[in-house]
Protein backbone atom coordinates (compact mmCIF):
# COMPACT_ATOMS: atom_id res chain seq x y z
CA UNK A 1 0.00 0.00 0.00
CA UNK A 2 1.45 3.34 -1.02
CA UNK A 3 0.57 6.22 1.29
CA UNK A 4 -1.11 9.16 -0.41
CA UNK A 5 -0.03 12.60 0.80
CA UNK A 6 -2.74 14.76 2.30
CA UNK A 7 -2.96 18.32 3.55
CA UNK A 8 -2.63 16.96 7.08
CA UNK A 9 0.79 15.54 6.18
CA UNK A 10 2.06 19.08 5.56
CA UNK A 11 0.84 20.55 8.82
CA UNK A 12 3.07 20.28 11.88
CA UNK A 13 1.23 19.85 15.17
CA UNK A 14 1.90 22.52 17.77
CA UNK A 15 0.57 21.96 21.26
CA UNK A 16 -1.09 24.90 23.04
CA UNK A 17 1.41 26.85 25.11
CA UNK A 18 -0.55 26.04 28.26
CA UNK A 19 -0.33 22.28 27.62
CA UNK A 20 3.40 21.47 27.65
CA UNK A 21 4.82 17.95 27.66
CA UNK A 22 3.47 14.52 26.93
CA UNK A 23 1.89 13.91 30.33
CA UNK A 24 -0.23 17.06 30.23
CA UNK A 25 -1.22 16.34 26.63
CA UNK A 26 -2.26 12.82 27.63
CA UNK A 27 -4.14 13.51 30.85
CA UNK A 28 -5.93 16.77 30.01
CA UNK A 29 -7.76 15.45 26.90
CA UNK A 30 -8.76 12.26 28.71
CA UNK A 31 -10.33 14.17 31.60
CA UNK A 32 -11.50 17.53 30.30
CA UNK A 33 -11.26 17.91 26.51
CA UNK A 34 -14.40 18.30 24.43
CA UNK A 35 -14.94 14.89 22.87
CA UNK A 36 -17.37 15.79 20.10
CA UNK A 37 -18.60 18.91 18.33
CA UNK A 38 -21.69 17.36 16.80
CA UNK A 39 -24.23 15.17 18.61
CA UNK A 40 -22.83 12.48 20.92
CA UNK A 41 -22.43 9.20 19.03
CA UNK A 42 -25.17 6.61 19.25
CA UNK A 43 -23.88 3.03 19.10
CA UNK A 44 -25.46 -0.12 17.75
CA UNK A 45 -23.82 -3.19 19.28
CA UNK A 46 -23.20 -6.41 17.39
CA UNK A 47 -21.86 -9.60 18.95
CA UNK A 48 -19.57 -11.60 16.68
CA UNK A 49 -18.61 -15.22 17.28
CA UNK A 50 -14.85 -15.67 16.97
CA UNK A 51 -13.12 -18.52 15.10
CA UNK A 52 -12.38 -20.18 18.48
CA UNK A 53 -16.06 -20.00 19.55
CA UNK A 54 -15.58 -17.02 21.84
CA UNK A 55 -17.07 -13.59 21.14
CA UNK A 56 -16.23 -9.94 20.64
CA UNK A 57 -18.58 -6.97 20.69
CA UNK A 58 -18.53 -4.46 17.84
CA UNK A 59 -20.03 -1.00 18.28
CA UNK A 60 -21.14 0.69 15.07
CA UNK A 61 -21.90 4.39 15.14
CA UNK A 62 -25.43 5.09 13.92
CA UNK A 63 -24.59 7.59 11.16
CA UNK A 64 -26.30 8.79 8.02
CA UNK A 65 -23.54 7.76 5.62
CA UNK A 66 -23.81 6.88 1.94
CA UNK A 67 -23.93 3.09 1.33
CA UNK A 68 -20.65 3.33 -0.58
CA UNK A 69 -18.91 5.71 1.82
CA UNK A 70 -15.71 4.35 3.39
CA UNK A 71 -15.93 2.45 6.67
CA UNK A 72 -13.45 3.64 9.28
CA UNK A 73 -12.59 0.88 11.77
CA UNK A 74 -10.86 1.87 15.00
CA UNK A 75 -8.86 -0.60 17.10
CA UNK A 76 -8.68 0.81 20.62
CA UNK A 77 -5.72 0.91 22.99
CA UNK A 78 -4.95 -0.98 26.18
CA UNK A 79 -8.17 -1.27 28.22
CA UNK A 80 -9.95 1.08 25.80
CA UNK A 81 -13.45 0.82 24.36
CA UNK A 82 -15.98 2.74 22.29
CA UNK A 83 -16.38 4.98 25.36
CA UNK A 84 -12.74 6.11 25.27
CA UNK A 85 -12.38 9.80 24.54
CA UNK A 86 -10.47 9.16 21.31
CA UNK A 87 -13.13 6.73 20.05
CA UNK A 88 -15.84 9.33 20.63
CA UNK A 89 -13.69 11.96 18.88
CA UNK A 90 -13.13 9.65 15.90
CA UNK A 91 -16.87 8.95 15.72
CA UNK A 92 -17.47 12.71 15.63
CA UNK A 93 -14.87 13.07 12.85
CA UNK A 94 -16.45 10.22 10.87
CA UNK A 95 -19.88 11.84 11.12
CA UNK A 96 -18.49 15.17 9.88
CA UNK A 97 -16.76 13.47 6.94
CA UNK A 98 -19.71 11.28 5.93
CA UNK A 99 -17.92 8.04 6.86
CA UNK A 100 -19.29 4.90 8.46
CA UNK A 101 -17.53 4.09 11.73
CA UNK A 102 -17.07 1.04 13.95
CA UNK A 103 -15.11 0.04 17.05
CA UNK A 104 -14.43 -3.69 17.46
CA UNK A 105 -13.57 -4.39 21.09
CA UNK A 106 -10.66 -6.58 21.98
CA UNK A 107 -11.73 -9.51 24.12
CA UNK A 108 -12.99 -8.55 27.53
CA UNK A 109 -13.03 -4.81 26.78
CA UNK A 110 -16.72 -4.29 25.95
CA UNK A 111 -17.94 -4.47 29.53
CA UNK A 112 -18.52 -8.24 29.52
CA UNK A 113 -15.85 -10.84 30.13
CA UNK A 114 -15.20 -13.12 27.19
CA UNK A 115 -15.49 -16.89 27.58
CA UNK A 116 -12.19 -18.29 26.30
CA UNK A 117 -9.01 -18.60 28.42
CA UNK A 118 -7.39 -15.70 26.60
CA UNK A 119 -7.51 -11.91 26.38
CA UNK A 120 -5.64 -9.69 23.90
CA UNK A 121 -2.13 -8.42 23.25
CA UNK A 122 -0.17 -6.04 21.05
CA UNK A 123 0.90 -8.66 18.51
CA UNK A 124 -2.52 -10.24 18.00
CA UNK A 125 -2.55 -9.90 14.22
CA UNK A 126 -4.67 -13.02 13.67
CA UNK A 127 -7.48 -11.31 15.60
CA UNK A 128 -7.07 -8.17 13.49
CA UNK A 129 -7.17 -10.29 10.34
CA UNK A 130 -10.46 -12.05 10.90
CA UNK A 131 -12.11 -8.85 12.15
CA UNK A 132 -11.07 -6.86 9.08
CA UNK A 133 -12.03 -9.69 6.74
CA UNK A 134 -15.48 -9.86 8.29
CA UNK A 135 -15.98 -6.12 7.88
CA UNK A 136 -14.81 -6.32 4.26
CA UNK A 137 -17.06 -9.26 3.42
CA UNK A 138 -20.10 -7.76 5.17
CA UNK A 139 -19.81 -4.40 3.35
CA UNK A 140 -17.97 -5.11 0.07
CA UNK A 141 -19.24 -1.85 -1.42
CA UNK A 142 -17.48 0.22 1.24
CA UNK A 143 -13.72 0.95 1.06
CA UNK A 144 -12.23 -0.09 4.40
CA UNK A 145 -9.89 2.16 6.39
CA UNK A 146 -8.34 0.99 9.67
CA UNK A 147 -6.71 2.99 12.43
CA UNK A 148 -5.20 1.70 15.66
CA UNK A 149 -4.61 3.65 18.85
CA UNK A 150 -1.60 2.72 21.00
CA UNK A 151 -1.76 -1.08 21.51
CA UNK A 152 -4.38 -1.31 18.76
CA UNK A 153 -1.94 0.39 16.41
CA UNK A 154 0.77 -2.15 17.26
CA UNK A 155 -1.54 -5.04 16.46
CA UNK A 156 -2.75 -3.38 13.24
CA UNK A 157 0.77 -2.65 12.02
CA UNK A 158 1.81 -6.21 12.85
CA UNK A 159 -1.10 -7.41 10.69
CA UNK A 160 -0.10 -5.07 7.84
CA UNK A 161 3.49 -6.30 8.04
CA UNK A 162 2.44 -9.95 8.01
CA UNK A 163 0.08 -9.39 5.07
CA UNK A 164 2.43 -7.27 2.97
CA UNK A 165 1.01 -6.28 -0.40
CA UNK A 166 -1.93 -8.65 0.04
CA UNK A 167 -3.34 -6.24 2.66
CA UNK A 168 -4.61 -4.26 -0.35
CA UNK A 169 -7.28 -6.91 -0.85
CA UNK A 170 -8.81 -6.02 2.52
CA UNK A 171 -8.12 -2.38 3.36
CA UNK A 172 -7.56 0.85 1.48
CA UNK A 173 -5.31 2.36 4.15
CA UNK A 174 -4.07 1.80 7.71
CA UNK A 175 -2.73 4.21 10.32
CA UNK A 176 -1.35 3.94 13.84
CA UNK A 177 -1.64 6.69 16.44
CA UNK A 178 0.68 6.94 19.47
CA UNK A 179 1.73 3.29 19.26
CA UNK A 180 4.69 2.07 21.37
CA UNK A 181 6.57 0.47 18.49
CA UNK A 182 9.50 -0.45 20.75
CA UNK A 183 7.57 -2.46 23.33
CA UNK A 184 10.60 -3.13 25.53
CA UNK A 185 11.47 0.57 25.74
CA UNK A 186 7.83 1.49 26.26
CA UNK A 187 7.43 -1.08 29.01
CA UNK A 188 10.55 0.20 30.73
CA UNK A 189 9.36 3.81 30.53
CA UNK A 190 5.86 3.15 31.85
CA UNK A 191 7.30 1.27 34.82
CA UNK A 192 9.29 4.22 36.18
CA UNK A 193 8.63 7.38 38.16
CA UNK A 194 5.52 9.41 37.33
CA UNK A 195 4.45 6.93 34.66
CA UNK A 196 4.46 4.09 37.16
CA UNK A 197 2.47 6.04 39.73
CA UNK A 198 -0.18 7.23 37.26
CA UNK A 199 -0.45 5.09 34.12
CA UNK A 200 0.72 1.73 35.49
CA UNK A 201 -1.56 2.07 38.50
CA UNK A 202 -4.53 3.00 36.28
CA UNK A 203 -4.01 0.03 33.97
CA UNK A 204 -3.49 -2.48 36.77
CA UNK A 205 -6.61 -1.25 38.56
CA UNK A 206 -8.56 -2.30 35.47
CA UNK A 207 -6.59 -5.35 34.33
CA UNK A 208 -6.11 -7.20 37.63
CA UNK A 209 -9.83 -7.58 38.44
CA UNK A 210 -10.54 -8.81 34.91
CA UNK A 211 -7.68 -11.29 35.10
CA UNK A 212 -8.94 -12.62 38.44
CA UNK A 213 -12.44 -13.04 37.00
CA UNK A 214 -10.83 -14.96 34.15
CA UNK A 215 -9.16 -17.18 36.76
CA UNK A 216 -12.58 -17.80 38.34
CA UNK A 217 -13.82 -18.84 34.88
CA UNK A 218 -10.84 -21.15 34.34
CA UNK A 219 -9.40 -22.34 37.69
CA UNK A 220 -5.68 -23.03 37.59
CA UNK A 221 -5.10 -20.83 34.55
CA UNK A 222 -2.36 -18.85 36.33
CA UNK A 223 -1.06 -18.06 39.83
CA UNK A 224 -3.66 -15.73 41.31
CA UNK A 225 -1.64 -14.76 44.39
CA UNK A 226 1.37 -13.86 42.28
CA UNK A 227 -0.81 -11.75 40.01
CA UNK A 228 -2.33 -9.90 42.97
CA UNK A 229 1.22 -9.04 44.04
CA UNK A 230 2.25 -7.74 40.57
CA UNK A 231 3.35 -4.12 40.79
CA UNK A 232 3.94 -3.26 37.14
CA UNK A 233 2.84 -4.26 33.65
CA UNK A 234 5.99 -6.32 33.09
CA UNK A 235 5.11 -8.59 36.01
CA UNK A 236 1.46 -8.70 34.97
CA UNK A 237 2.35 -9.69 31.41
CA UNK A 238 4.75 -12.38 32.64
CA UNK A 239 2.02 -13.94 34.78
CA UNK A 240 -1.03 -13.42 32.58
CA UNK A 241 -0.69 -12.02 29.07
CA UNK A 242 2.34 -14.02 27.91
CA UNK A 243 1.36 -17.54 29.05
CA UNK A 244 -2.29 -17.18 28.01
CA UNK A 245 -1.26 -16.37 24.46
CA UNK A 246 1.48 -18.94 23.93
CA UNK A 247 4.54 -16.88 24.84
CA UNK A 248 7.29 -17.97 27.21
CA UNK A 249 7.42 -14.60 28.98
CA UNK A 250 7.16 -10.87 28.34
CA UNK A 251 10.47 -10.78 26.45
CA UNK A 252 9.30 -13.55 24.13
Placement of each model-derived feature along the sequence:
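Short amphipathic alpha-helix adjacent to the substrate-entry channel of hydrolases
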Residues: 86-103
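Alpha/beta-hydrolase-fold enzymes
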Residues: 3-5, 137, 141-245
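Catalytic nucleophile-loop/oxyanion-hole region of alpha/beta-hydrolase
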Residues: 93, 107-145
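C-terminal subdomain of alpha/beta-hydrolase-fold enzymes, centered on the catalytic histidine
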Residues: 252
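Short substrate-entry loop that stabilizes the transition state in hydrolases
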Residues: 78-85, 95, 110-113
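N-terminal cap/lid segment of alpha/beta-hydrolase-fold proteins
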Residues: 22-64
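Short beta-strand element of the alpha/beta-hydrolase
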Residues: 69-77
Amino acid sequence: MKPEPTTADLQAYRAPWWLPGGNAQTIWPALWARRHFGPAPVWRRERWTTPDDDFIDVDRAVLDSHPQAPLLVLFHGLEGSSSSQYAVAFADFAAAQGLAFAVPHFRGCSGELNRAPRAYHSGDFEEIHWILRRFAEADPQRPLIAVGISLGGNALLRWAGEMGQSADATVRAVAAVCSPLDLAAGGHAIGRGFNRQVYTRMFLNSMKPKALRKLAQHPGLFDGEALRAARDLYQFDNLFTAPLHGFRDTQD
